Amino acid sequence: MFVFQIETSDGMNTPQYIGSLNTVSEIDWYHHCSTNSTAVNDLFTGQMVDMRLCDACLRVAVSTQLFHILPVPIAEPYPLHGLVSLEACLAQFAQIELMGGANGLVCDHCNRLRLLSDRSSRPDPAVVVTPIGNHITPLSPISGGSDLMNDSIGRETQQRTSTPIQSRPQPSTSLVLTDCRRRSLIGYLPSCLVIQLMRFSAGPGRQSTKLCLPVVIPLNRLDMSLYVLHNVDPAGAGLSEPSEDFYNLYAVCLHLGSDSTNNGHYVTYARCADDVWYCFDDDQVRAVNIEYELTTRLVRQNAYLLFYERAF
């Protein structure tokens, strides 16, 4: 993971901001490619760029994260037909998210300023007037001191995952949480893109729950260009340059039954070398019409992992 901080920014779509993000993304990606050259990395590894803009000081924390599986939240269904499009899920993944309160940002810069302000406002022990019998010497301890300089703004980045995890630990009471805007985009797309639909979340009592909303899965020409960092237009008027980031589906993994990933049954639909789609259900294998299967309630409500390959 690579962590970087942009000193000031007027927003998340300014030319300075986008240009700096592209530089950070390229440095991290070229370093990864120069030190990792395997078939798995060449085919399945991509890069995600996570940005957090502090609303108080307008500094941007940037972190990069390599991925083999891209976790994507499930969007709200369309009111008319109750279906969810995969494109809507990807758009929700890439949208700017407002965060505050307990989910706010531990901004290194803001906390450093607060620490310096506290220290400057603290009375000098050498000149404090104290009652007789309670004389302060240079060796007397000073209460209330704390060192926040080791906290990094980049440490706030959490890996996205569909697997239920424990709630985020609350920061020390001496730290200040600031409101922020968060956005995640894709720095580099892999040749083989694996999308994980985030169907599982932690419920009351740490029990996981499964979201069975029906997701419409494109078979061909899934356009990923809208979610790639170097395609973001600083003016907000669309793509800054043409892109050819289309993907075709070659496999789908379903999770059936349980509300937990630890249990349940997995079924896979895959396109084989003969260009025929098959359903793999334990020891049972049968040829299927994938265009029909993708319209069924079984597939739409239980699709968990989607396997796409770049279209050439």
Range-by-range predicted roles:
Residues 26, 30-34, 58-312:
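Exposed substrate/partner-binding surface patches
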Residues 1-66:
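Papain-like cysteine protease catalytic cores
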